[in-house]
Amino acid sequence: MATEFTGVWGRDSITLETGKWAKQAHGSVVYKTGNLVLLATVCAAEEPKEGQDFFPLTCEYTEKAYSVGRFPGGYFKREAKPAEHEVLLSRILDRPIRPMFPEGYFSEVQLLVQVLSADKQVSVQGHAINAASAALSVSSIPFAGPIAGARIGRIGGEFILNPTNEEITKSDLDLVVAGTKDAIVMIEGEASEISKEDMMAALRFAQEQLKFAVAMQEELAKKHGTVKKEVVLKAPDKDLHAKIREFAFDRLTLANKNADKAKRNDDIKAINKETVEHFKTLLAPEDKTKDIKHFLHELEYEVVRELVLGEGIRFDGRKTDEIRQISCEIDVLPGPHGSAVFTRGQTQSLGVMTLGTTSDNQRYETLEGSKEKNFMLHYNFPAFSVGEVRRNSGPGRREIGHGNLAERAIKKVLPTQTEFPYVIRLVSEILESNGSSSMASVCSGTLALMAGGVPISGAVSGIAMGLFSDEKGRFAVLSDIAGIEDHFGDMDFKLAGTKKGITAFQMDLKVNGLGLEVLQKAIEQAEVGRDHILGEMNKAISSVKGNLSENAPRITQKQIPKDRIGELIGPGGKMIRAIIEQSGSEISVDDSGKVTIASPSEESKEKAIAMIDGIFEEIEVGKIYDGVIKRIADFGAFVEILPGKEGLCHISKLDVKRVQSVRDIVSEGDKIKVKVISVDKMGKIDLSRKDVLLDN
């Protein structure tokens, strides 16, 4: 039976429909606002696969080219590999939805959100989260939702719910929040160095807006008559669990106090192996290896959390707000345009910068049309960084997401194209990882930019905050979490910013929601940590010369009249190609007449500028020019005195004495000095070498 709910959320009219399209899916919702139409579908396997011990959730967001009346690009003219922005939005769907499933639920779930009709002014992020949650809410799949998502902007100090794409370009905040009626589940976004107070105000505003979107979904599910499937989880063997606890708890506690990741992992593996062997022998012939390993993992979870919540001790002996040891090196590579290594504990990032020209802009397609980026940050996470062996198959969702977060953190401090007309590419090579590698990428990227002479408005540092909490109400917010604290913790909250304020943030949870008071403590504690990290970075920055690398191109920009662009390009591009070939510089011109010159050396730059200036220079009668013989005729020689401007030096004016043959005096390609005698109404230039010789 078809069910529909319509309501007004902020400035938007929202319609949710179910039971009309995609009825064989376990849950499906058509979500409409403006011209935007989303189809969200979800299906779940009846039972988990044999031996399954994790939750296999897949969330995918896809945009159909037909949604804006366009053909897909490429030879086959059909949608193929997801674009980077689709991958990023898929991650935004996954992160708030994953913690809302019951613990121990291991059936495979596939959630798809497709854009069937696009509205170029509607930002889709929050609506996509709502559509996904609504599909789960009307299904029988166990789900502790609904949750809602909203995008928040701020213009002129006023917060805006679901700003249009045009409004986002004017906003100093781009925040995507997901949550329940009374708790936050996920945060992601960027800002123009906002204060922690403004950040909290934005979260409070967002929390209020989410309530109505949650209520809409609840009303739809109620109308639809949704009945949730009861999940029957395997009852644990309490007796075996108690025996394993008695056998391994104290030893695991001691092993988890080792700050060295490799040594700690080796010790824990040895304890686990010994425990498994001991109980396999004890329980033979019954094989309970999987149960033993599961209980050991639960035991380590308990150990790590009790150390923090009960004793106030982190595995490496740090206080809850203490940052690991930091070291910074700059100019570590001679070839690149800028480089630095940032090390924090056992996490290390090599940041490498390359400067390019407008021809290096990244061009990409979205439903809003073609776009270009002049700054990009690419994050690489090789297997060796964590001492593993695996196939290198290129960047996955995690690499794309981490790179995007670091890129958003840094881009707010970059100079404008007018101030610094370069395209910038940063690469973060993770050399070793033990937590918070994306924030290490922010730090190494900032150092590489400054080492390479990019005039950024301020240094950016990043930190990852964690949380341990329990049912007794105890909680501890941890600064600069290591890998084990991320793995066993409840929160991974990354914040980046300058001394002035926050530039980027991302929060994931493993619990189904946090109150604003916990988030406020994390944001305040993060600011102290970021300031400490900036202090360590500044020690290295103080030695930076601030000059462009000798290997970097020299870029100059000139403005020429719009109506004379054709003169620079020349017929069939002849003129601009000649300047490029002769000067060795790369040259481009846009529709406004802005000319960009990228040169490998100062000499190349000066030559290109002189040739361009020459095109627009007015010929002066009586002035002596350095010319090049272009053609020879019986009656004289044609001499180029400025780019694209030739005059005739008649045979009678080639020398002070009588000339029998032009070739007796000059040949093609010869350089000679000539004086301009006259320029007629048709622009024909009369030249004389004879007058120059007589003057001398």
UniProtKB/Swiss-Prot annotation:
This is Polyribonucleotide nucleotidyltransferase. Keywords: Cytoplasm, Magnesium, Metal-binding, Nucleotidyltransferase, RNA-binding, Transferase. It is found in: Cytoplasm. One of its GO terms (biological process) is mRNA catabolic process. Residues 553-612 form the KH domain. It catalyses: RNA(n+1) + phosphate = RNA(n) + a ribonucleoside 5'-diphosphate. NCBIfam families: polynuc_phos, PRK11824.1. Its EC number is 2.7.7.8. Residues 622-690 form the S1 motif domain.
